[in-house]
C-alpha cells in the first residue's frame, strides 16, 4: 500500500496545480462542489492508470506439465518483479515503466514496440507510385574465413536499424562526453549492426557517418536495440564466432565504450551461443533470449554501468531436446512470448520467469511473434518454416490466445525446402508478419517462402506476399514474388486510410503493394539483396543489404 500511495502523489499534485486553478477561476461552483470535482477527476485518473499497469495473472496452464525447465536467480537482493509502481527518468521526466516504447520518437528495438507489431507505420500522401533512393552508406567488408563461411558487410537477417530523434539535453551530453562524434552528428540518427562486426551510426538526413563505428569484432546478424530510456545504452548481439567467445554486448554511447560482455555460458543447455534476438527492456530489466536455449533477465544498472545478471530460464518440452531462440521476445504487460527452433511457442511470467504455457507449432520458428491486444486480451500470430519436416511440409500460421495458449485458428500452407548446390533454403515464414492498418485493419501480411518452388524452376526460390484475415485465418490473396523473401514488410497509410506495403526480396527487388488488393504498384531491383528489415519514418525508410550497403528510400 505504501508503494501505491507514493505512485499517485505526483499525479495528485499535477492535477491540483494544473487543473485546480482552472476550475476555481470558473466562479460558478461552490468550494464543496469543486472539491468533489477534483476528487472525482483524481479517482478517474487513478482508475485509468491502474487499468494500464495492472499485471496479468500468473496462471499456469496444464501444458506446463509437458515441460522441463530450470529457473536460476543470481541476484537475490533485487526483487525480480516488474514494479509498475516505480517511475524512471526519461528525457528529464518521470515515465511509467509500462510504456517505455509507447509514444517514443524512434524505433529502438526490432519492429519498434514490445508487441513487435511495427505500430509506427509510415505516412504518405495519395497513391504511391515509385520508390526513390535517397542515399547509400557503405560499410566495411570482412571476408575472414569462419567455420560458417565468410560474411562480408552490409546487414543480413534480421538486421533492422535503430532510429532515434535525440532530445536536446541528450545531444548536449554527447557533445560533452563522447569522443566518437563526427561533424555530421545530428538530432536524427540511424544505428545498424553489420555483418562485418561493426555498429554504424548514420545521420538520417545526409547519410554520412554521425559517429565513429563501434567494433564488436564478430558478425552481427540480428537487430541491435537502444535502451528506450535514452540513457545511452546500446545492446548488441553477436551472431558468428569469428573470434571466440561470442555473446551479448552493451555499449555506452556517452563514452563509446563497452560496459558489458556476457561471454560463453557454460551452464547453457546448448553450446551454440549466438544472439540474433533483439533484446527488450521492461521496467528496470532487460530480457534477452539466446540460441543456447536460455532466456536472460538482466538488471539495467544506473549511471550506464552496464548490466547485472538477475535470472536465467532454461526450458524444453518433455519430448525433444532443448532448442535455441532466434526471434525476439514479444511482451504485453508481464507476459513474454517466444518461439524455438524445434517449433514450440512458450509463454513466461516476466516477474518470476515461470513458464505459464507452451504450444507445439511443429517446426522451426524464426519469425518473431506479433501481438494484437483486443479488449484487453492479447492475441498472438506466429508461423513456422519447413525445416525438420523434410523436403515438403506446411508453414503452420496460427493465432493463439496469449493468456492461455489456446488455438483460435490455424492455416497450414504447403511449402517446400530446396537444396541448391551445397545450400538449402527452408520454406515457410522467416519474415515477421505485419498487422494491417487503415482499410486493411482486418488483415495480417506475411512473406511465405517457396510455397510451390522446386529445384527445376528457373526461379526456384520464390515467395508469396500473403494477406490473411485476422478473424478467420483464411488467405485473402497471394501476390507472387520471384525470389525468397526474409525481409519483414512495413506499412504506409495515406490521408484517406488506404494502406500500402513496402517489402523486398533476396534478389534486391523492392515492391510497393496495395494492401487491400495485393496489386503491385511498383517493383524494381534496387540493391544486391534484401534480408534485413526496414525502419520507417514518415514517407522514408532505411534498410540494409548484404554486401556493403545501408540505403535510405523515399516512397513517392
List PLM regions with ranges.
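Extracytoplasmic/lumenal domain signature
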Residues: 35-96, 102, 117-157, 162-276, ...
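C-terminal motif of bacterial Sec signal peptides marking the signal peptidase cleavage site
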Residues: 21-24
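Short polar catalytic/cofactor-binding loops
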Residues: 111-115
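Bacterial N-terminal signal peptides that target proteins for export
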Residues: 2-10
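Intrinsically disordered, low-complexity linkers and terminal tails enriched in Pro/Gly
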Residues: 30-33
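Bacterial signal peptide processing site
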Residues: 26-28
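Short glycine/Trp-rich loop-beta-loop segment that forms part of the substrate-binding cleft
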Residues: 107
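Hydrophobic membrane-insertion alpha-helices, especially the h-region
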Residues: 11-19
Amino acid at each position: 500500500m505504501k508503494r501505491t500511495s507514493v505512485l499517485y502523489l505526483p499525479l495528485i499534485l499535477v492535477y491540483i496545480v494544473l487543473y485546480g486553478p482552472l476550475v476555481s477561476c470558473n466562479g460558478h461552483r461552490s468550494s464543496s462542489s469543486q472539491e468533489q470535482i477534483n476528487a472525482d477527476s483524481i479517482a478517474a485518473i487513478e482508475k485509468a492508470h491502474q487499468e494500464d499497469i495492472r499485471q496479468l495473472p500468473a496462471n499456469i496452464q496444464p501444458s506446463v506439465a509437458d515441460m522441463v525447465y530450470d529457473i536460476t536467480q543470481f541476484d537475490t537482493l533485487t526483487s525480480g518483479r516488474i514494479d509498475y509502481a516505480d517511475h524512471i527518468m526519461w528525457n528529464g521526466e518521470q515515465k511509467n515503466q509500462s510504456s517505455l516504447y509507447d509514444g517514443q520518437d524512434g524505433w529502438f528495438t526490432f519492429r519498434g514496440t514490445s508487441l513487435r507489431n511495427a505500430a509506427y507505420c509510415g505516412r504518405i500522401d495519395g497513391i504511391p507510385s515509385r520508390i526513390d533512393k535517397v542515399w547509400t552508406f557503405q560499410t566495411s567488408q570482412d571476408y575472414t574465413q569462419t567455420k560458417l563461411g565468410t560474411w562480408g558487410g552490409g546487414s543480413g537477417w534480421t538486421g533492422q536499424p535503430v532510429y532515434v530523434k535525440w532530445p536536446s539535453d541528450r545531444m548536449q551530453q554527447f557533445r560533452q562526453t563522447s569522443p566518437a562524434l563526427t561533424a555530421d552528428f545530428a538530432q536524427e540518427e540511424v544505428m545498424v549492426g553489420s555483418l562485418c562486426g561493426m555498429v554504424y551510426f548514420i545521420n538520417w538526413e545526409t547519410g554520412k557517418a554521425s559517429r565513429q563505428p563501434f567494433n564488436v569484432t564478430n558478425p552481427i546478424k540480428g537487430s541491435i536495440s537502444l535502451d528506450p530510456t535514452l540513457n545511452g545504452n546500446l545492446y548488441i548481439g553477436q551472431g558468428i564466432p569469428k573470434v571466440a567467445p561470442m555473446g551479448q554486448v552493451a555499449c555506452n554511447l556517452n563514452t563509446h565504450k563497452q560496459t558489458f560482455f556476457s561471454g560463453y555460458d557454460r551452464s547453457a543447455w546448448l553450446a551454440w551461443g549466438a544472439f540474433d534476438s533483439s533484446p527488450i527492456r521492461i521496467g528496470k530489466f532487460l530480457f534477452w533470449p539466446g540460441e543456447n536455449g536460455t532466456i536472460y533477465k538482466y538488471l539495467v544498472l544506473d549511471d550506464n554501468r552496464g548490466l547485472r545478471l538477475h535470472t536465467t530460464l532454461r526450458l524444453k518440452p518433455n519430448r525433444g531436446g532443448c532448442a535455441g531462440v532466434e526471434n525476439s521476445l514479444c511482451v504485453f504487460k508481464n507476459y513474454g512470448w517466444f518461439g524455438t527452433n524445434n517449433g514450440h511457442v512458450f509463454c513466461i511470467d516476466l516477474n518470476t520467469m515461470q513458464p505459464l504455457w507452451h504450444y507445439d507449432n511443429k517446426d522451426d520458428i524464426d519469425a518473431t511473434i506479433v501481438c494484437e491486444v483486443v479488449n484487453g486480451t492479447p492475441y498472438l500470430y506466429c508461423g513456422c518454416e519447413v525445416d525438420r519436416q523434410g523436403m515438403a511440409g506446411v508453414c503452420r500460421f496460427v493465432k493463439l490466445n496469449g493468456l492461455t495458449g489456446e488455438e483460435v485458428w490455424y492455416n497450414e500452407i504447403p511449402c517446400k525446402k530446396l537444396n541448391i548446390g551445397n545450400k538449402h533454403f527452408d520454406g515457410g515464414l522467416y519474415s515477421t508478419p505485419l498487422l494491417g492498418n487503415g482499410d486493411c485493419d482486418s488483415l495480417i501480411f506475411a512473406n511465405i517462402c517457396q510455397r510451390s518452388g522446386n529445384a527445376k524452376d528457373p526461379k526456384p526460390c520464390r515467395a508469396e506476399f500473403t494477406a490473411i484475415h485476422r478473424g478467420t485465418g483464411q488467405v485473402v490473396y497471394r501476390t507472387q514474388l520471384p525470389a525468397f523473401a526474409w525481409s519483414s514488410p512495413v506499412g504506409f497509410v495515406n490521408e484517406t486510410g488506404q494502406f500500402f506495403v513496402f517489402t523486398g526480396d533476396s534478389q534486391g527487388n523492392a515492391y510497393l503493394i496495395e494492401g487491400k488488393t495485393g496489386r503491385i504498384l511498383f517493383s524494381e531491383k534496387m540493391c544486391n539483396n534484401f534480408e534485413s528489415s526496414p525502419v520507417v519514418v514518415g514517407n522514408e525508410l532505411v534498410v540494409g543489404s548484404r554486401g556493403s550497403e545501408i540505403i535510405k528510400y523515399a516512397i513517392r
